[in-house]
């Protein structure tokens, strides 16, 4: 907003002052000196030697930052070698990936990188992350906060991988026809893609307890596989939630919930099919809705669209906190499970699913003529409705969002007649 822009402008102005620039240069030079001392401890480097940075990938951001400094320090060449390389911007640096654009198109690399956080988790060490270097080059690490069970999972996975690498040749009666670099790469990518995109039940159980370290100077972690969160997202937001970029390992979550949907979304991503959530809105359910303010009321018919698992989502515009909405579920079905009632800005609904749910607030529904059977399951009379008063003190056009599962749907013609 306006305040954020003001703070950003002030921050940039402060950075441009001679005093701050000099301080940044001095600290940067000091850090570079400590880091090169650390590198020298790891391997004897002579003038003119090539320094090679080896990492999982995937953009080579560290190399982007230190390439010039390392080259000046050694007077030699700097190279980066990665498992997967997909640069966000072309850097023109010496970078190569075991898997990169020489072998696969950008869409394939994006698919692999979307769920690649699991590889990061399996590759971390029990030692804490390096946050600085001492004057002699020794690393300064933050405290290791990982749980013992995480370490156990990593140990099992690594032990198995090393054992496989040592004994992999024993599985062949004779060498395969494509036993060259390209053939081995093809096999490796196939195995990696299967793990990242179509994990089996045993792998899902192995990954279930892992948490992803956010890094960025914080100790925050996110659940790597959040099946309950993904299921709720599908129920409330449908495919739009499944396509959300906020999920760390979406293929694993969808594979556990709905393998057919997972495979369909993977196919669309692989072939670059530009499918939007609105393209998949079919078999909508007409719902009569009463909109009323202090002076008048009217009845309209709105369409609730399927999300997942038999649930529907109905959006009811209520203006700038103007209208009370009466959703006449009794005209739609004799029974209904109400999963969620929220109020949010209309503008938020045009953005990503993460933006949509970030600013929504719980509604205050009144269940008129609806008898509770069990938890969120209600029996509805023909005149039953959910009444949602408008929220107070919210600016901009608002809308009520109701997620429900009708049971025993009434014929659509009867619904239209009732409206």
Regions of interest found by a model, annotated:
Residues 1-288, 406-418:
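Long, low-complexity, Lys/Arg-enriched
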Residues 43-49, 317-321, 393-396:
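Flexible, charged surface loops at secondary-structure boundaries
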Residues 49-53, 323-327, 400:
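Generic beta-sheet signal
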Residues 145-151, 155, 159, 306, ...:
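Mixed-charge (acidic/basic) macromolecular-recognition segments
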Residues 271-288, 349-419:
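Activation corresponds to long, low-complexity, non-globular regions
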Residues 294-319, 361-378:
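Extracellular carbohydrate recognition and processing domains
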Residues 314-337:
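Extracellular beta-strand ligand-recognition surfaces/modules
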């Amino acid at each position: 907003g306006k305040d954020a822009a003001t703070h950003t402008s002030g921050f940039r102005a402060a950075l441009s002052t001679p005093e701050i620039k000099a301080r940044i240069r001095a600290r940067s030079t000091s850090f570079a000196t400590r880091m090169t001392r650390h590198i020298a401890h790891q391997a004897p480097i002579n003038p003119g030697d090539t320094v090679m940075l080896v990492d999982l990938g995937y953009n080579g951001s560290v190399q982007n930052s230190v390439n010039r400094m390392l080259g000046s320090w050694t007077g030699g060449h700097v190279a980066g070698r990665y498992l997967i390389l997909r640069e966000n911007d072309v850097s023109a640096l010496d970078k190569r990936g075991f898997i990169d654009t020489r072998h696969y198109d950008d869409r394939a690399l994006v698919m692999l990188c979307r769920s690649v956080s699991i590889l990061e988790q399996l590759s971390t060490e029990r030692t804490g992350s390096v946050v600085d270097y001492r004057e002699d080059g020794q690393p300064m690490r933050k405290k290791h906060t990982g749980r013992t069970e995480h370490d156990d999972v990593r140990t099992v996975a690594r032990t198995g991988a090393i054992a496989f690498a040592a004994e992999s040749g024993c599985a062949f009666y004779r060498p395969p026809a494509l036993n060259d670099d390209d053939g081995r790469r093809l096999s490796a990518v196939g195995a990696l893609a299967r793990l990242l995109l179509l994990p089996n039940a045993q792998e899902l159980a192995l990954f279930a307890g892992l948490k992803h370290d956010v890094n960025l100077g914080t100790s925050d972690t996110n659940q790597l596989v959040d099946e309950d969160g993904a299921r709720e997202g599908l129920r409330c937001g449908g495919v739009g939630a499944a396509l959300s970029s906020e999920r760390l390992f979406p293929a694993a979550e969808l594979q556990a919930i709905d393998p057919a949907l997972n495979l369909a979304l993977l196919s669309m991503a692989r072939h670059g099919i530009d499918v939007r959530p609105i393209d998949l809105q079919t078999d909508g359910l007409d719902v009569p809705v009463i909109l009323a303010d202090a002076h008048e009321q009217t009845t309209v018919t709105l369409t609730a669209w399927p999300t997942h698992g038999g649930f529907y989502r109905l959006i009811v515009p209520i203006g700038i906190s103007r209208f009370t909405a009466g959703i006449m579920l009794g005209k739609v079905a004799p029974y209904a499970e109400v999963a969620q009632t929220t109020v949010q800005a209309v503008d938020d609904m045009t953005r990503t699913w993460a933006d949509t749910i970030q600013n929504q607030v719980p509604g205050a529904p009144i269940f008129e003529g609806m008898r509770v059977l069990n938890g969120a399951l209600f029996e509805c009379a023909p005149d039953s409705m959910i009444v949602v008063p408008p929220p107070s003190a919210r600016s901009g056009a608002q809308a009520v969002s109701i997620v429900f599962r009708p049971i025993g749907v009434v014929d659509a013609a009867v619904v239209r007649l009732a409206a």
